[in-house]
Amino acid sequence: FYYAGEWYWGVDRLYHLENRLSELGGDKQVQVPLIAPRQEITSGDVRDNGSLTLEVFASLRSPYTSIAFDRAIALAKDTGVTLHVRPILPMVMRGVPATSEKGIYIFTDTAREARAASVPYRRFYDPIGEPVRRCYSLYPWACSLGKGNQLLSSFLRAAFVDGVNTNTERGLKSVVENAGLDWMDAKLLVGQDGWQQALEDNRLAMYDSGLW
């Protein structure tokens, strides 16, 4: 659905339109709830015993991942479900066609979702290509130290919040250290192979789930 320069690609985005029309004076019954309000995610009082699993397919160049990753980790912790983080390559690095219009929509949609959720989303420095590969090459090592999620979170913040050039040694160093890892150790491992097959397995699992 398109209205006055803004796309609404699903029912879950119509609250943006309702709020926009309300700000323009179109809401004549302000006491009446929105027809399609934003769905808040709450953990509730009942905790799982680990029998349920939350799978997170995380891409280091995805705006959506950047605003959802930390919240997904927190949700798993709060609810007691088992968290399974499954990193994947960005769409354009695995051959998924993406028009400029689609890219613009994704970035603008993420921005309005971030504002609604009060999630940081400010300066973007594109990590496409080598920065993503270099970070993923460190991921198995970070996981062995119990810092895999911290590494991904740190990279996403650098790329989508702080505007860090992760293509430089200085940028990657800040990512590593902000994740609580030792840069001198990381320098010896950057660029190593051994991570690609796991990401390919994750890609296939994601496609099998009907996701892209």
Q: What label would you give each PLM region?
A:
Residues 2-42, 68-75, 154-212:
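C-terminal cap of thioredoxin/glutaredoxin-like
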Residues 5, 49, 60, 98, ...:
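Conserved aromatic-histidine-acidic binding/catalytic patches
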Residues 45:
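Phosphate/dinucleotide-binding and metal-coordinating scaffold of catalytic cores
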Residues 48-49, 133, 211:
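A generic fold-level signal
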Residues 48-63, 83:
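Short active-site neighborhood of thiol/selenol oxidoreductases, capturing the structured segment around
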Residues 55-61, 126-129, 186-191:
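Conserved strand-turn element in the central/C-terminal portion of the radical SAM core barrel
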Residues 64, 102-106, 194-198:
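Soluble or luminal CAZymes and related metallo-dependent hydrolases
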Residues 67-159:
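Structural alpha/beta surface segment adjacent to cysteine/selenocysteine redox centers
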